[in-house]
């Protein structure tokens, strides 16, 4: 998170990694009016419940995208740290392009915002993941990375992210057991994706159950 941030969150991390302002991130992510990514804690006492729900859902969706693409890269042979860096870089690069478009009068609304339930936006991210992972692996000197295995799984990984993020989008509160169950599916998805990539790397055909969720 940027220096001076009161909370560390996926949104503040995007700011720090992308060199973006709070205003740019809030607009690209379509955060509720008045929400400061550096200070807003959806679980703090007295926060607006509607804003808290919206912000936490977006945070969960960002984490689903980053961690799932990272799991695919790790399963294909990248280090855990390198895989996360590659996935985060892929997301940040797309967000930065959207932020640059905020001042472009010819850009469409979709080109100025990111929706982690939209296949089109997830496709922009997935197109960067394999190259980003390869770059990180090369810089680290990690051996055993199989780019083809990762490339073979990015489509299903993106589809699975969309399916889980659609479930997150449908959440109506932050406290019910149903919500906690939805938020906990992220870990299950990550394990499925990593295992599928490991299978692909070993010469098999990896599959992700959440592709059909």
PLM regions: where:
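Feature for extracytoplasmic/surface-facing segments of secreted or surface-associated proteins
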Residues: 1-213
